[in-house]
Amino acid sequence: MKRKLGHEPDEDIFNIFCYDLKTLDSLINMINDYDKKKLPPKRQRRYYPSKMHLLPDILSDLEELNKMTGLKKFKIQLLEQILFFIQDIDEKIMLHTVLEGPPGTGKTTVAGILSKIYAKIGIFKKVKFNVLKRSDLISEYLGGTTIKTTKALDRCKKGVVLIDEAYSIGSTSGEDIYAKECVDTINQYLTENYDKIVCIIAGYKQELDRCFFSINPGLRRRFPWTFTIDNYSSNELAEIFYKIVKEKEWETTCKESDIIDIINKKHNLFTGNGGDITSIVEKSMINNCRKNFGKEQKYTIELDDFIHAMNIFEDNKKGKLNNVPYGMYN
């Protein structure tokens, strides 16, 4: 509940014109001020966006997203989407979204945060988020895919559904009749239920175009929003390294400059992005435990542990590692 306007200094009164909303940071700052400062009289607020009052509800979700490493382009694209919808310009525009990006860049996490934002800005009454994959949609019997896909989407109604790695549904040849049946069903379902479900498709841009959208030419029109998630830079991968070490309640003596330098020299190998860093941290931990077997000096990753893990990672990527017990480094 906002306090009534009295004789307060101008800096204590919210002024919507003071904010240059070009980044997610700027939007978060504005929402914080809107939530905490006194509002001007109603006559001065008549041009405020009609859903302005809902912004504080998504503040924690925006802050969670903003803390994620990287995602610079995506964060700007999301800012633009939010600013559009809180102005209530056109409620008929569908929210079906494409998340284009490589593995290990947090697409599933991002989709989950999007589901909370969509619910809280009035798209749905409560947060509901489901993830579907090919096995949830494709039947082993001809004609059964329509039924299976429809039932799967019915379970996701009144919420957000993520079809992860959607390109796996189809093939480059376009001759998979089961995939055709599935994609046609998705297209029809989204058309008939445009206000009852939000569908997010995630995967590589080229593979999505070749193996998913090409199956039904009208499907792309159902997805008016396309967000791009880029590969992580060397600096961002290093940042993720330290985050994962902390999450595992370990420590490290590795200098950030050394980590960045080593990653930068092999940056082309990091096709799995954050997933690759997780693997390297775990390999580093394994090496640290081996060399400190029976000693107290554990739980601290040193530079030689990281280098050892990087060498194994590189060999794995290049297919040179042999005679290693299955699953040891996967």
Where are these regions (language model features)?
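N-terminal accessory segments that target, anchor, or regulate ATP-driven/P-loop NTPase machines
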Residues: M1-H53, I93, Y194, V198, ...
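Pre-Walker A (pre-P-loop) alpha-helix and adjacent loop at the N terminus of AAA/AAA+ ATPase modules
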Residues: P56-T97
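Walker A/P-loop
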Residues: I93-K128, K151-D154
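Canonical AAA+ ATPase core
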Residues: G112, Y167-G174, V183-A238, E247
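Conserved C-terminal "switch" segment of AAA+ ATPases
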Residues: I121-K126, E207, C211-S214, R220, ...
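Short glycine-rich substrate-engagement loop in P-loop NTPases that contacts/grips substrate
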Residues: K126-C156
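Conserved P-loop NTPase "ATPase switch" module shared by AAA+ and STAND
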Residues: C156-Y178
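C-terminal engagement/docking regions of AAA+ P-loop ATPases
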Residues: K291-N330
